[in-house]
Amino acid sequence: MGLFSMFKKESNEKPDISEIAYDYDGYDIAFESGKTEPKLYSEINNIVTNNNFDINNISEYKNLNINSDYDTFLTFYDSWLEELKNNNYVIHLDNYTNITDFANKINQLLDRINSKKKIDVDLITNEYKEELKKYSFMGNDIEENFNYDVLEANIVAQELRKIGYELINFFIGYDNNDKTIIKIDDIEKLKEIETKIK
């Protein structure tokens, strides 16, 4: 059950953050030595960057094509992710990220991949504030372990779908809190690549 379906339920109790489903996609792209072809990461890179960033410029990717072991992959993955973040293709989202800043960075990312579409930052900010009130039942303080980032990501994901994009993050055995977007039309292609990696 998604975030906004849950809020339609009649209840006199404060919603529990643990009940909120992640309303965005995650992809497990962890390398398997002897099985995973490095070129698959080039295909992922092209989807994420809309062919605007050449992964072959990363020396660690060249090394992965020569020495395909897990340690080499981790070195490549860290460098690749850093390059994507430095070039505004990936956004870090954690509990300290402001919703307005996150939404603005999403629009910068849309610019980066040559999209003419935008999400409404003011609408998202106001919607987030309204949803947040539902976790402060009868004026009580929000619990210390509240996952603000999950709520932010879910709201932004809903708005992105309206303009044809999906919010995603990658897993390599753990969630690194780094998000990016892809065209909804590319979801099946990315899922197919994921099955080839594993």
Residue ranges of model-derived segments:
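Contiguous interface-forming segments/domains that mediate binding rather than catalysis
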Residues: G2-K198
